[in-house]
């Protein structure tokens, strides 16, 4: 099922029995986030929340409800992308990557259905007034204080838009980028844009600054859930996130022209903030911010965005999220990326069977990888290859295990790893780029990494002892116990 709007997504969550409507007055300053944090820590991620009576900083009631933890469970994450299991999209990517031009006219004709599917992905421009421009604030009408922008943690530098889709365009090639960068509210019409140096939006800004030209920026808040997710996906700079969202939705994203700048926006967005960055202006202080590491990221200097227009639907929902000590909603977004992009990782490192980034590792700190080991030193080959893969280059600890290990179960992965390693023999250290949020690295964005080879050791690797087999019950006994289990009076596992 493809969902075209955020409201449709919320209705689908409600129909699935996973939405709690909070009708009691709750402050956008801290209270809303404390409630959300407690819910996100519940087993399975807790329900989605729709706060219908949000109190703004001036004590008045917001006209707009706030949705939070909308993506915060495995079932809701799958629902948002229109699949039963997140691996389903990975399977679709595998089939596309396996496209080989067959011999003969009939063979070529057999490819048409898959090629036609690809042709449906690019976004389409919508004619007429789009839903996202049913209400328009321009110039002096712009007042960000009227939006339920949340303050998450006590030491945060201010209120933050935490689920934005930041739209920019490459000034050289005209390629659009949609990124998810936190945005701090500084005033009624001013924001601070936190895009880290390695992000595509930051590269666009640097290019515009070198030219001395104002940079148009659009911030969409709320859209179809596939587009919202795609803004967080680690796509190459040349891939339009709206094309990827079209692939996930199985139909194109509808776009519309912004009113005050030369950019396109999701036609079905709930809110759109249009504006610009002036390269002649000094950078502004952004932060601190309670981040997904569970620690505050410190204040730093970033560009200011001047908002020239705010447009919205007539009855919009303001989506938000919070990050902090794991597990949080962002774990489920990251898990979707893990499942969807596995085929692309296998394309360049074919011996990989699976990989997993557990919640405690907050994505970049810990990665488990299972491989089909065929020759000595292969685990280290895989480590080096993964450290050369885009954002995987930021991984601090890589643990490589054999193909039979379920890396999606961290308890099993650690059990195998801690039994299989000789620390001196099986660990390797190297230096490389680190996440900008890593406060432990010896230098900003640069530090050490550790690789752990927890695979079964081969004689060629200098292991001369017998390697013990894993304990397993025989299949006949398991079948016999399965048959008698209902009569034993023991609760089902």
Listing of model-derived features with the role each one plays in the protein:
Residues 1-288, 292-304, 308-493:
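Extended, highly charged
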